[in-house]
């Protein structure tokens, strides 16, 4: 830990890492698992396409927009409001993630910190399975097989971008990747959300701040 990290954050991190050190966790494996499920689903969906009509590509775009809304709603709702039925989400996100990483201490330090950034491993598998079932048993009979494959690909692509951009946002401030203007913007966008006074009010989208614009919760850093 560096001297620039507030004492309260250092204390929280020490206590959390003491618990984490008692568990078997490898951040590298967590990332590989996430990539295997999400990239695997995307590749499978694209390989299954056959004679795609131009109009069917709209389901890929629609999935990206729909997942952006789901991300916004889930982040602004259950992740920041202690609803009794899903209080665990609030605990893990607001009480742990937002106290492990604040706007004054955004960066992770090693692979074990990935546990505080990535969704749990089971979530990657559940999303892929759900999207492939939706593709097969809803889109294919109701619209077309291509529509289903493109929707599933778009949904998994958005989730993949979410995870990768979230990891990126917790890189060191001076990382050269932030010289790319859109990535620097997304990093600052998320850093503002990590300000404790703002975390339940602004900047709920991470990968694509579309619905922060729609619902007027976009705040510049």
Where are the language model's segments positioned?
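Helix-coil boundary and interhelical linker segments in multi-pass alpha-helical membrane proteins
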Residues: 43-59, 136-150
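Short hydrophobic/aromatic segments of transmembrane alpha-helices and their interfaces
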Residues: 14, 54-62, 150-153, 180-181
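Membrane-embedded catalytic scaffold of the fatty acid hydroxylase/desaturase
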Residues: 69-152, 156-221
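Alpha-helical transmembrane segments
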Residues: 29-36, 57-60, 125, 147, ...
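N-terminal signal-anchor transmembrane alpha helix
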Residues: 58-74
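Cytosolic-side membrane-entry/anchor segment at the start of a transmembrane helix
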Residues: 1-41
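Hydrophobic core of alpha-helical transmembrane segments in multi-pass integral membrane proteins
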Residues: 30-48, 121-138
């Amino acid at each position: 830990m560096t001297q620039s990290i507030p004492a309260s954050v250092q204390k929280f991190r020490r206590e959390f890492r003491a618990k984490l050190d008692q568990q078997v966790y490898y951040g590298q494996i967590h990332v590989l698992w996430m990539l295997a499920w999400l990239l695997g689903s995307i590749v499978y969906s694209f390989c299954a396409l056959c004679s795609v009509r131009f109009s069917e590509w709209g389901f890929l775009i629609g999935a990206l927009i729909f997942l952006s809304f789901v991300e916004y709603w889930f982040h602004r709702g259950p992740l920041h409001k202690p609803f009794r039925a899903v209080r665990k989400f609030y605990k893990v996100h607001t009480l742990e993630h937002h106290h492990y990483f604040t706007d004054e201490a955004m960066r992770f330090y090693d692979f074990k910190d990935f546990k505080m950034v990535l969704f749990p491993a089971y979530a990657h598998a559940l999303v892929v399975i759900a999207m492939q079932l939706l593709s097969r048993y809803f889109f294919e009979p109701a619209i077309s097989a291509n529509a289903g494959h493109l929707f599933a690909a778009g949904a998994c692509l958005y989730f993949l971008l979410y995870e990768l951009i979230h990891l990126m946002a917790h890189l060191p401030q001076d990382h050269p990747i932030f010289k790319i203007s859109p990535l620097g913007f997304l990093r600052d966008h998320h850093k503002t959300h990590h300000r404790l006074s703002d975390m339940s009010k602004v900047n709920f989208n991470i990968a694509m701040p579309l619905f922060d614009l729609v619902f007027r919760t976009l705040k510049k850093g």
